[in-house]
Curated annotation (Swiss-Prot):
EC number, UniProt record: 2.7.7.7
Gene Ontology CC annotations of this record: DNA polymerase III complex
Pfam families the record matches: DNA_pol3_delta2, DNApol3-delta_C, HolB_lid
Assembly and binders: The DNA polymerase holoenzyme is a complex that contains 10 different types of subunits. These subunits are organized into 3 functionally essential subassemblies: the pol III core, the beta sliding clamp processivity factor and the clamp-loading complex. The pol III core (subunits alpha,epsilon and theta) contains the polymerase and the 3'-5' exonuclease proofreading activities. The polymerase is tethered to the template via the sliding clamp processivity factor.
The encoding gene: holB
Protein name: DNA polymerase III subunit delta'
Organism: Yersinia pestis
NCBIfam families documented for this protein: holB (TIGR00678), PRK07993.1 (NF005941)
GO biological process: DNA-templated DNA replication
Entry's Gene Ontology molecular function annotations: 3'-5' exonuclease activity; DNA binding; DNA-directed DNA polymerase activity
Keywords: DNA replication, DNA-directed DNA polymerase, Nucleotidyltransferase, Transferase
Length: 340
């Protein structure tokens, strides 16, 4: 697994707590997606299970380290949903607990990693609580979570909370620039900055967004919006939005609306879409502040419905949203869309 320079400090702090006897058996790691959190948890797991630690590093040579490197350590448990399911049910947790109360096969620590703790059902989380309160000897739980507020409060209270902050912008841009130079792919600095801001400062998420195929989709959407505004035909965006990635594409549009609001308030230097400033200015000039605010709220609500409502009619939802947007921009008035 790759390692990233911004993880050095949090890794040393977490390992330092364990090496001095202050480490908690249950870690709740809160991070934005694409910040390297899986690499940090993997490195901490290796250190906890290493049989010949070298200070804050795992040795890489002992039998436990070799098993971890091979990806088949019998005392390292990765708890994820079963194939075809989106949540971790109570039966999976019970099976795990039964294994944890048996002797470690390698005679050392046992480590459980939950890559997305928020997908635990309430019943599964409750089943895990008792074990978190009284864990088997030398057993560690590493919970990775992007939305800790969605976890049961009782589960959060049993864990040591750690927020993995995104690195400074300068560090992120330096790292991104290095990645694209290695691949000999030219990427404009303004594009890297925009991708980083669209990813809320998470460098790995920004790197994925900058992949030529994905970045070209965003560029095409921005071009399509510009043409749609010129023709007063927002519905023409429907083919570009009606896609499995609709939620992300709506987020891109929302960021443009919010940038237009910033521009109207004289705060254009804080715009997210630094590579699309002419489009931001166009939006700022054709719509009043109240209209932009309402459209941004409607887009956020539309996105929430796409992500949370099972079986929602995506095409109908997007069509109503675009027609409402078209009316608002042409008349300066807006309506409140009904909830589907």
């Amino acid at each position: 697994m790759n390692w990233y320079p911004w993880l050095n400090a949090p890794y040393r702090q977490l390992v330092g707590q364990h090496s001095t006897g202050r480490g908690h058996h249950a870690l709740l790691l809160h991070s934005l997606p694409g910040n390297g959190e899986d690499a940090l948890i993997y490195a901490l797991s290796r250190w906890l299970m290493c049989q010949q630690r070298q200070g804050e590093k795992s040795c890489g040579e002992c039998h436990s380290c070799r098993l971890m490197l091979a990806g088949n350590h019998p005392d390292w448990y990765v708890l994820t949903p079963e194939k075809g399911k989106s949540s971790i049910g109570v039966e999976l947790v019970r099976q795990l607990i039964d294994k944890l109360y048996s002797h470690a096969q390698q005679g050392g620590a046992k480590v459980v990693w939950l890559p997305h703790a928020e997908v635990l059902t309430d019943a599964a989380a409750n089943a895990l609580l008792k074990t978190l309160e009284e864990p088997p000897e030398k057993t560690y739980f590493l919970l990775d979570c992007h939305q800790p507020a969605s976890l049961l409060a009782t589960l959060r209270s049993r864990c040591f909370y750690w927020y993995l902050a995104c690195p400074d912008t300068a560090i992120c841009l330096q790292w991104l620039n290095l990645q694209w130079r290695k691949r000999q792919i030219p990427v404009e600095p303004v594009a890297m900055l925009a991708a980083l801001k669209l990813s809320e400062g998470a460098p790995l998420a920004a790197e994925r967004l900058l992949q030529p195929e994905r970045w070209s989709i965003r560029s095409a959407l921005c071009s399509g919006l510009r043409e749609a505004l010129n023709r007063s035909d927002l519905l023409s965006l429907l083919p570009q939005l009606n896609h499995d990635d609709a939620a992300e594409r709506l987020q891109w549009l929302s960021s443009l609306l919010l940038d237009a609001l910033k521009w109207q308030q004289g705060a254009g230097e804080f715009a997210v879409n630094q590579d699309q400033l002419p489009l931001v200015q166009q939006l700022a000039h054709i719509a009043a502040t109240p209209v932009l605010l309402q459209l941004a709220k409607q887009l956020a609500h539309c996105r929430h419905q796409l992500l949370s409502v099972v079986g929602v009619n995506r095409e109908l939802l997007l069509t109503e949203q675009l027609l409402s947007w078209e009316t608002a921009l042409s008349t300066g008035t807006y309506s409140t869309l009904p909830s589907l």
